[in-house]
């Protein structure tokens, strides 16, 4: 069995010695949503790295760059964009297109630095995963 007083959120600071499949399943269920969120952040910032664009194009760019392996969920995209704007990583402007207002997003200098850091961190993480899986 495993220590039950420590929540799974503190798993990074705790060494676990699983004795059954329950722990592995619980760890996977707590890690995968964070992994997907991290991939979504990387996909959105990467889509904005080349040019200013709007939400639908961000989703298309992520889909195109991953050859259809990853899609940015619309329900996750706009809250994430608002968060990135609040954090100063992305700027937003509005423009009227065919009678409707459209929000265009672009990376700030701070956003470019964050993207560079994320790319470096993800490359290191992928190296570890490849070593473990390969």
Task: Give residue spans per PLM region.
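Intrinsic-disorder-associated, low-complexity terminal segments enriched in Asp/Asn/His/Tyr and depleted
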Residues: 2-3, 21
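Short alpha-helical segments that sit at the start of domains
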Residues: 12-51, 83
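Beta-hairpin "wing" of winged helix-turn-helix
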Residues: 85-101, 106
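Basic, amphipathic "hinge/linker" alpha-helix immediately C-terminal to the N-terminal HTH DNA-binding motif
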Residues: 100-119
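Amphipathic alpha-helical dimerization/coiled-coil segments
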Residues: 7-19, 26, 113-134
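Basic amphipathic alpha-helical segments that dock to polyanions
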Residues: 77-84
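N-terminal helix-turn-helix DNA-binding core of bacterial DNA-binding proteins
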Residues: 32-76
């Amino acid at each position: 069995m495993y220590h039950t007083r420590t929540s799974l959120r503190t798993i990074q600071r705790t060494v676990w010695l699983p004795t059954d499949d329950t722990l592995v399943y619980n760890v996977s269920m707590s890690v995968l949503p964070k992994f997907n969120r991290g991939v979504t952040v990387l996909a959105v910032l990467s889509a904005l790295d080349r040019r200013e664009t709007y939400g639908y194009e961000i989703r298309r760019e992520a889909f195109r760059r991953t050859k259809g392996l990853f899609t940015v969920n619309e329900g996750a995209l706009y809250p994430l964009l608002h968060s990135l704007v609040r954090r100063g990583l992305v700027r937003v402007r509005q423009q009227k297109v065919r009678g409707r207002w459209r929000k265009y997003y672009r990376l700030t200098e701070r956003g470019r630095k964050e993207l560079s850091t994320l790319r470096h961190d993800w490359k290191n993480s992928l190296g570890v995963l490849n070593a473990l899986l390969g």
